[in-house]
Regions:
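N- or domain-start disorder-to-order transition segments that initiate the globular core
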Residues: 2-48
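Hydrophobic, small-residue-rich alpha-helical packing segments that form membrane-like cores
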Residues: 145-166
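Secretory-pathway/luminal and periplasmic proteins that interact with or process carbohydrate-rich
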Residues: 81, 98-102, 134-139, 165
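Residues that form generic nucleotide/phosphate-binding pockets
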Residues: 91, 131, 162, 166
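M16/MPP (pitrilysin/insulinase) zinc-metallopeptidase core fold and M16-derived inactive scaffolds
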Residues: 45-124
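A structural signal for the main folded, soluble domain(s) of proteins
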Residues: 4-12, 24-29, 60, 65, ...
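M16/insulysin-pitrilysin zinc metalloprotease superfamily fold
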Residues: 78, 113-151
C-alpha cells in the first residue's frame, strides 16, 4: 500500500505520510514535521502500557575525537531551563521510567525514554528535549564527566574510563 498524505496539521506539526508497516499491517506509522523547527517525528500508536521515545540527532564527525560521545554524557548534566545534574533521573523515578540512557553510533546519537503510562511521559518529554537541545556545557561538567586527573595522579573521568574499557 502506498503511503497516504493528507497534510493534517496539529499545532506547528504537519503530517507528511501515514503508512502501515509491511510486516505488521495493523500497525500504522505516521511521519510528522514541525513547520517551526524542522523536527521530524515518527509516530506509531498501539496498545501497550509502555511509551517509548528515541530522540535521535545527527552527530557524525570524521575524526576519532569522541566529541559526540562526550556530548552525549554532558547532556545529562543539565539544561538551560533545568541547570542541575539529576533532574532527569528524579523525573524518571516519578514517571515509572526505566531511567535515562543514550548511545552514540557512527552518524547519530540516540537518547531513549521509556515510561509506564502517558502522564509521566508527557511530563518528562519536554524536560528531556530541553536537555538534548539546550544542554549546559560547563568546565565543571567536563572535568567531572569526561576527563580529569584524580588525587592519585591517575587519568580519570566517566567517558575516559568507558573508552579505556573498549
Amino acid at each position: 500500500m502506498a503511503p497516504s498524505v493528507d497534510s493534517e496539521v496539529i499545532g506547528s506539526f504537519r503530517r507528511l505520510a501515514r503508512e502501515p508497516l509491511p510486516y505488521a499491517p495493523d500497525l500504522v506509522v505516521e511521519k510528522w514535521r514541525s513547520t517551526a523547527s524542522g523536527l521530524t517525528v515518527l509516530w506509531a500508536q498501539f496498545d501497550n502500557p509502555l511509551l517509548n521515545a528515541y530522540i535521535t540527532v545527527a552527530s557524525e564527525i570524521f575524526t576519532d575525537s569522541g566529541v559526540p560521545h562526550t556530548l552525549e554524557h554532558l547532556v545529562f548534566l543539565g539544561s538551560q531551563q533545568y541547570p542541575y545534574k539529576g533532574v532527569l533521573d528524579s523525573l524518571a523515578n516519578r514517571a515509572f521510567a526505566q531511567g535515562t540512557n543514550a548511545w552514540t553510533a557512527n552518524d547519530h546519537t540516540a537518547y531513549t525514554l521509556t515510561t509506564a503510562g502517558s502522564d509521566g511521559f508527557l511530563r518528562m518529554l519536554p524536560v528531556y528535549c530541553d536537555h538534548v537541545f539546550f544542554p549546559t556545557l560547563t568546565d565543571a561538567g567536563f572535568v567531572t564527566e569526561v576527563y580529569h586527573i584524580n588525587g592519585k595522579l591517575e587519568d580519570a573521568g566517566v567517558v575516559y574510563s568507558e573508552m579505556q574499557g573498549r
